[in-house]
Structures are given as structure tokens and as C-alpha cells.
Amino acid sequence: MAAAMASHVSTARSPALSFSSSSSSFFPGTTLRRFSAVSLPSPALPRLRVSCQASSVTSPSSPSDVKGKSDLKDFLAIDDFDTATIKTILDKASEVKALLKSGERNYLPFKGKSMSMIFAKPSMRTRVSFETGFFLLGGHALYLGPNDIQMGKREETRDVARVLSRYNDIIMARVFAHQDILDLANYSSVPVVNGLTDHNHPCQIMADALTMIEHIGQVEGTKVVYVGDGNNMVHSWLELASVIPFHFVCACPKGYEPDKERVSKAKQAGLSKIEITNDPKEAVIGADVVYSDVWASMGQKDEAEARRKAFQGFQVDEALMKLAGQKAYFMHCLPAERGVEVTNGVVEAPYSIVFPQAENRMHAQNAIMLHLLGF
């Protein structure tokens, strides 16, 4: 199967990933310029397996059956894996994206395989990207919405996990409590992919990393500034900063900082420069990416008005992007409330890459599933 893939990618090359061998956390004096894409050959795929819309919570406990950093059964958090594995998955995402963009439809590694998609929280992007991606690679995905499955209420999570494992080859779940995804993975005998929890959103950040590589040329050594609530998106950026060295800044109002334990863990990894600040104007200077998310996530709508008041001064507008500098891109995990956390002008500006970013959800997730299923 991998050999067939290698023959396909020879006619559909994509940007190569750039990760320097330096272990330094920051690269002063390095100027990264904005460009639309890098046209360099990528390595053939290896033969062996390899918010948005959620509120922030405290760090959850870890699953009890953690294996090696490269051969984990599940994809629950980016920093569960080592740097080499994350690089391999991103390489794979780039290759498979190029293959699909070329019109090639004969690479079907998921043929005969099925996936259950559990949605305690609805999401257009998560459902369409997973379902379409799995289909394009030959598989069949089943949607299980809130009315179809209620883990921990109508049926215990451990029972759901063991039943679905007997029907499916892989499970994706988008849930509220992070403990739900940990329990699902612990009792499932097939791989489980974290489609989002209140604690983190690893698939989104993998897509974001792929998007940065395509437009900037690399993740390593860049400056990413997140402006807004220190929520699950920030937690997953911190996960990425634990395995790839770059400069990450979270600019948020006082009282809305990310989980302290999560921040501490990322700093202890010793790879990236990490800052938490309450001054967005100072934070964005020299940024390669300015990133935003909704101020009131799903399950927080009763706090929306209070949050709007608390987040005054944290809107990403044209003036803030000007402070960031000419090389800065704007990214947003979507859905966006235009006129609230970001202006319409910023979303529609030439430096906005929110829609390539949204597309890359599918390609990053395809690569994650290929890795977990041994392709």
C-alpha cells in the first residue's frame, strides 16, 4: 500500500516541511517572509505505521495505558507523541493533500474500513472534514449525534467504547469533558481520535501547523500570537510548543489565562519560548501569525455579554495587524463572529489564510488516521 502511495506522489508533489535540527527555542535575527507556497519535493510516505467552540478547564488526568511516544494507539494530544512522529504525520498530510489535489483517486488505504464519529457537540467543519476525508481514502464514516449516543448518560462510556470497537476500525469523538475522551480511548480496542474536548483541540492545531508550513515554509522559529480567551485552542498550541520549537504568545484579559499546569508543562519541555500577557498590542509586534477564536464558546453563551465587556481591546482589527507587521498572517479556527473577536476586513484581507486553514483540517486528519491505522 505504501509502495502504491509512493508511485502516486511522484506526480503530485507538495511543499516540504522545514524543521531545523537546532534545539534552540528561539531564533533572533531570522526574518521569515510571507509567500504563498513552497515548491519543493517531499519524502515518500513511510512504509510502516506511524474552540473551536469549547471552554477552558483544568488539566485532565492521563490515560492509564500510555505506550511509547511513537506507537500510541490513539491521537488525544499532540505532546503525547515525539517530535519525529509529529513531523512524520505532517509530512504525510502534505503528501496526501498533493495526491488528492492532483485528482488521483486510486489510493484507497481505508477501503473496507469504517469509522464511528461521536458528536456530543455539533460541528460543520469537524464532521465534513472527517467524513469526506475518510471517504476519499476509501472508507465509510458513520455519524452519531447527541440523539444517537449519550455517553455516560444513556450508556456508560466503557460500554460504548467496547461495542463500537467491535463494529469499527477507528473512532472519532467530539465531546465536552476531556475525561470522556480518555475513558473512550482506555476501553476501546481500536484507535480513538480526539475531535475536540473542553481541554484541547489537537486536530485543529495539526491543520494549523500544516497551513503555516505551506505559507511561511516552517513552524520552527516562527512567532505565533494568540489573541483572546486562553481556552482549549491555546492548550493545543502549548502542546505543539512542547514538541516543536517556536515562540508562542497568548494575549488574553486578566482572569482568562490558559491552565497554569498546561503552561508549566510546555515551559518545562524547554523547546519553545512561551509568554502569557495581557497586552495584545505589545504581543503582536513581529508576529508571523496572529491567531484568534470566539470569545464565548459552545456552553458559554450565557456569558457572552460579560465576555464581550471583559475582552474589549482584544479584537483583531486592521490596526492590530498593522502593528504585527507586513509578514504577519491572520488565522482563525472558525466559526468566527465577525465584528466581535475579529473584524470583517481582517477575515477578508489578503493576509488572512483562514480558508486554506479550514481545508487543511481534512488533510491533517487524514494523515493522523493513516498513522494510527498503520499506513
From Swiss-Prot:
Belongs to the aspartate/ornithine carbamoyltransferase superfamily. OTCase family. Residues 1-53 form a transit peptide. Pfam families: OTCace (PF00185), OTCace_N (PF02729). Keywords: Acetylation, Amino-acid biosynthesis, Arginine biosynthesis, Chloroplast, Plastid, Transferase, Transit peptide. The keyword Transport does not apply. It is found in: Plastid, Chloroplast. This is Ornithine transcarbamylase, chloroplastic. PANTHER family: ORNITHINE CARBAMOYLTRANSFERASE, MITOCHONDRIAL, ORNITHINE TRANSCARBAMYLASE, MITOCHONDRIAL. GO terms for biological process: L-arginine biosynthetic process. Carbamoyl phosphate binds at S123, M124, R125, T126, R174, H201, Q204, C333, L334, R361.
